[in-house]
Amino acid sequence: MSIEVFNESGRGEVNEEELIDVARYALWTLDVHPAAELSIHIVDLETIEDLHVRWMDLPGPTDVMSFPMDELTPGWGRKDAAEPSPAMLGDIMLCPDFAEGQATRAGHSLAHELDLLTVHGVLHLLGFDHVTPEDEQKMFALQNEILANWYDSQEERGVSFAPKPTGAGAFPSAADRDDTQN
């Protein structure tokens, strides 16, 4: 799986290897073809606001945006699945300046917030959405399950990033989040 991170935000504290690992884990969990490609862009408030206005026709900045390229669905590893070809999933745009406020309000680190938003972005690239309350509940439940399992699997996989956060805001429901994620 090819995952590239482009830090265009000027924020040096963003752990690019951690974002790659959590994205790779999410894609693996969802049975995405191992040759799939993904780009993660770390951007500033001005850039994310411009994208948010231009592509979503919504004012102001946001935390994460996803731009899918090839249509791809989870499940390539199933025995009954057709053999897919490698695909370019698309781009995830993360804004640590915006995410930092959300992390503070939720009582956890910026790193955890960016991990959560990375999983959220991956799900959007794979066609998950939160337009209806039912879809929102399913998407956030899956997002939280993947993220919690990623934390739990670190030792087994021989990686060590941050410890699994605890507290009410660590793995939010859809109702706990601002309605600014896209």
Swiss-Prot record:
Q: Where is this region: Disordered?
A: 157-182
Question: Which coenzyme or cofactor does it need?
Answer: Zn(2+)
> Which free-text remark accompanies the cofactor?
Binds 1 zinc ion.
Q: What is the protein name stated in its UniProt record?
A: Endoribonuclease YbeY
Q: Entry's InterPro entries?
A: MetalPrtase_cat_dom_sf_prd (IPR023091), YbeY (IPR002036), YbeY_CS (IPR020549)
What family does this belong to?
A: Belongs to the endoribonuclease YbeY family.
- Presence of keyword Hydrolase: yes
Gene Ontology MF terms: metalloendopeptidase activity; RNA endonuclease activity; zinc ion binding
* PROSITE patterns from the UniProt entry: UPF0054 (PS01306)
Q: Which UniProt keywords apply?
A: Cytoplasm, Endonuclease, Hydrolase, Metal-binding, Nuclease, Ribosome biogenesis, rRNA processing, Zinc
Species of origin: Corynebacterium jeikeium (strain K411)
GO BP term, example: rRNA processing
Main role?
A: Single strand-specific metallo-endoribonuclease involved in late-stage 70S ribosome quality control and in maturation of the 3' terminus of the 16S rRNA.
Localization per record = Cytoplasm
